[in-house]
Amino acid sequence: MSGRGKQGGKARAKAKSRSSRAGLQFPVGRVHRLLRKGNYAERVGAGAPVYMAAVLEYLTAEILELAGNAARDNKKTRIIPRHLQLAIRNDEELNKLLGKVTIAQGGVLPNIQAVLLPKKTESHHKAKGK
């Protein structure tokens, strides 16, 4: 025979996504497509979408971890925008990164100036001492 057909060839391996190869949850293929369609550069390397997906996944995990802690502190089981706001604004680095970002329904950080707080009276202690 002249080598036609697949008599003894190995079966093709099952397709494996680039996300699973990189050990990521975020979609590497989608990030690659968005980088190409976004006109950021004429060409996009193979490693760029993997790296970017990993960075996005890390930042998301970090924010969700802190927001989950904020929800637990408020005795809630569901993360709401308020918890995201508290998580981001209480973390120095995330606050710097997302400083110009407005979170809808996030509210503000509770902050009362020390000058406005009621003064502690010392006269009560002096009266007992006499």
From Swiss-Prot:
**Covalent cross-link Glycyl lysine isopeptide (Lys-Gly) (interchain with G-Cter in ubiquitin), where:** K14, K16, K120
Q: Where is the composition biased (Basic residues)?
A: 7-19
Symmetric dimethylarginine carried by residues: R4
Q: Which GO terms describe its cellular component?
A: extracellular exosome; nucleosome; nucleus
Q: What residues bear N6-succinyllysine in this entry?
A: K10, K96
Q: Which GO terms describe its biological process?
A: heterochromatin formation
Region annotation (Disordered) maps to: 1-22
Chain positions found as N6-glutaryllysine: K96, K100, K119, K120, K126
Q: Which residues carry this modification: N6-lactoyllysine?
A: K10
Chain positions found as N-acetylserine: S2
Q: Does the keyword Acetylation apply?
A: yes
- GO terms for molecular function, please? DNA binding; protein heterodimerization activity; structural constituent of chromatin
Tell me the residues on which N6-acetyllysine occurs.
K6
N6-(beta-hydroxybutyryl)lysine occurs at K10, K14, K37, K96, K119
**Which coarse location class describes where this protein primarily resides?**
nucleus
Q: Keywords, A to Z?
A: Acetylation, Chromosome, Citrullination, DNA-binding, Hydroxylation, Isopeptide bond, Methylation, Nucleosome core, Nucleus, Phosphoprotein, Ubl conjugation
Instruction: List N6-crotonyllysine occurrences by residue.
Output: K37, K119, K120, K126
Q: How is it modified after translation?
A: Deiminated on Arg-4 in granulocytes upon calcium entry. Monoubiquitination of Lys-120 (H2AK119Ub) by RING1, TRIM37 and RNF2/RING2 complex gives a specific tag for epigenetic transcriptional repression and participates in X chromosome inactivation of female mammals. It is involved in the initiation of both imprinted and random X inactivation. Ubiquitinated H2A is enriched in inactive X chromosome chromatin. Ubiquitination of H2A functions downstream of methylation of 'Lys-27' of histone H3 (H3K27me). H2AK119Ub by RNF2/RING2 can also be induced by ultraviolet and may be involved in DNA repair.
- Residues with Citrulline modification: R4
| PANTHER family membership | HISTONE H2A
Q: How does it assemble?
A: The nucleosome is a histone octamer containing two molecules each of H2A, H2B, H3 and H4 assembled in one H3-H4 heterotetramer and two H2A-H2B heterodimers. The octamer wraps approximately 147 bp of DNA.
Protein name stated in the entry: Histone H2A type 2-A
